[in-house]
Design a protein with these regions (language model features):
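Alpha-helical subdomain
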Residues: 3-173
Length: 173
């Protein structure tokens, strides 16, 4: 997946900023904005400073449910969707679609079931934990692709990442 044309990644629920730090380290034209709650942004800023990336990564204190998304051409969610039921995930998907300009991309990075939801074991076990601790569950690539399609995204693709993680991506036409 070629991300070289993107200039600003909004790392939604970006936590420590680990994904933003890695992304800007390998994509020289990319800047990142970590969107999270105040105390979490403070921690992320410490890591950004530790890596000397203050000129390329900023933090933005906001609540992903209630506050508007700042302008960006790439929306990135890592380990977010599994915390929420389908209707909340769709809300985020649609919010990204409305916020992105044409040509903008969404990327969802998460532990995924196979499309038949028969395995693998790790996402199934993880789903049980999520159902007990959060409102969420594990999803399949097909389920997340369906959410992206319903929201209006095109060129939807699922790519395996590391371990049981995959990325689901789509473009706003």
């Amino acid at each position: 997946m070629d991300l070289s044309r993107h200039q600003l990644m909004l790392d939604i629920g970006g936590g420590s900023g680990a994904h933003s730090i890695r992304a800007v380290s390998v994509l020289p034209n990319l800047r990142a904005l970590i969107l999270d709650l105040g105390p979490i942004c403070e921690v992320a800023q410490e890591f950004v400073t530790q890596y000397g990336l203050q000129d390329r990564i900023r933090t933005h204190v906001a609540n992903m449910w209630n506050d508007p998304f700042p302008k960006a051409d790439l929306h990135f969610y890592s380990n977010i969707y599994h915390d929420w039921p389908p209707e909340r995930c769709y809300f985020l998907t649609e919010k990204s679609f409305k916020s992105l300009e044409p040509g903008g991309r969404i990327i969802i990075h998460d532990v995924l079931y196979n499309d038949e939801k028969t395995g693998p074991f790790a996402p199934a076990a993880y789903s049980m934990l999520m159902m007990g601790w959060t409102e969420g569950k594990s999803y399949s690539g097909a389920e997340l692709s369906g959410m992206l399609k319903e929201a209006g995204f095109h060129d939807i693709q699922v790519h395996p990442a590391f371990g049981y993680f995959s990325v689901v991506t789509g473009l706003k036409p």
